[in-house]
Amino acid sequence: MFEKVNPAHPDKVADRIAGALVDLAYQKENNPKIAVEVLIGHGICHIITETSVTLSPDEVAAAVSRIAGNLLVDYREVSQDEHLADNQIDGIHCGDNGIFKGVPVTDEQKELTTIAKKLYETYCSDGKYILDGDRLILCQSNAQTGHLREVFPDAEINPLGDWTGGTDVDSGATNRKLGSDMGDSVTGGGLHGKDLSKADVSINIYAWLKAQETGAPVELVCAIGNDAVDGIPYERIVETARAFIDRIGGFEKSAEWGLIC
């Protein structure tokens, strides 16, 4: 069984805003340190950023407006904790403790992701979908159930009726849709809104890529400050993750569909 949400789901909107701010930080420095938390809904977007670079309120507001529309932006920026900053002075080290399990993507997960993308291309609005064997559940906002039934005659469609969705009727928060992003993979922390020094980003990506390459689960553990994980230099893990993010198109882009894209 698998659940997939599209980029217009409020939680993914929060992830995308967080990713956009990380992209901004990387435009200012090659290796910034940044962690972004976003809570959005009902006309307001709260953002707290711990960062080594300064993001102007205008830059932040522009990113929110582009992704989520005209909202009141409540932005709080603080400097990165000095102990965490010191951890990176003499090289790239794991920015936190963590457990990570990369798992190969299943045919079911690929199939549902294809369906989700097809619906998003058509409606470009909030949607959440489940596939469990032969059972397909489609919750698609701003769509007529009858039209969806023509394409998916055997699906359970909008069980409570047609709906509008989005941040006007629901709230969203960063890293709340990791099942959609990662499938059967496991993480102790969130994937989005963080720079590449954060193990939650780089080791998750590395483990997931290795699982796809080998066809078997990959389990890794790290402690904050480690310069190697399972005998692999952490710098190499970070560069592998950087190449993946660059290939996708940046942190905001990677937040749209997660690792299963």
Where are the regions that the model predicts?
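A domain-level signal for the structural core that forms small-molecule/cofactor-binding pockets
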Residues: 1-261
